[in-house]
Amino acid sequence: MSVISMKQLLEAGVHFGHQTRRWNPKMAEYIFTERNGIYIIDLQKTVKKVEEAYYFLREVAMNGQGVLFVGTKKQAQDSIREEAQRADQYYVNARWLGGMLTNFKTIKGRINRLKELTKMEEEGVFDVLPKKEVTKLRAEKEKLEKYLGGIKEMKELPGALFVVDPRKERIAVLEARRLGIPVVAIVDTNCDPDEVDYVIPGNDDAIRAVKLIASKMADAIIEGRQGEQLSVESTAQEQVEETAQEETAVEA
């Protein structure tokens, strides 16, 4: 059974590309035709590419690595947050801060500051501080939460990135490439597919299209994490059985 159907892709409008004057010739192999000045994406290729990305992210999750969802354009923000949270993963949906990957040590310092402010608020420290200072601290906390809230539990670099519109998220893609982190992305007809390891040709501007593909990537991660859990449980069971066999052998 395929990961995604042509019907699902059509209903979500994944096949609508950009205007023909706004295109990247490198995307030619993924274009089916042109209609009323708009490129139509070949959904047969999209089905295949979604499957490739699905199995890759499932493998990443099975290996116990995290996946960072990135989509800061308005149409992607909610889906990126919702699907990353559903898969218990990390996300950036407000703005990519330069160095989020390549200077992760510094970013971790800002995350620690966010956690410190959150703890202060929870423990009632804000209640005893001067009002002016509390206003300033709350503003700092809100800003950090907006930009770093989705990665505050990310203790190490992710095993992969899932990106909506690599053209807009170019800095994130470049940082990942520099560090050798594979990139899975929804790539529209105006993007450069060469910058992406797992290209999913599709409409990156329609909310339903982004939601559909992001949800499939989240499904892959959830499936992979269940596989990782089963693998850990299986190994533990084998160790218990081996110990029991050794004890039996010693007694004999």
UniProtKB/Swiss-Prot annotation:
Keyword field: Ribonucleoprotein, Ribosomal protein
Entry annotated with the keyword DNA damage: no
GO biological process: translation
GO molecular function, a single term: structural constituent of ribosome
Annotated stretches, region: Disordered: 231-252
GO cellular component labels: cytosolic small ribosomal subunit
Bias (Acidic residues) ranges: 239-252
Family designation: Belongs to the universal ribosomal protein uS2 family.
Protein name according to UniProt: Small ribosomal subunit protein uS2
Organism: Acetivibrio thermocellus (strain ATCC 27405 / DSM 1237 / JCM 9322 / NBRC 103400 / NCIMB 10682 / NRRL B-4536 / VPI 7372)
Originating gene: rpsB
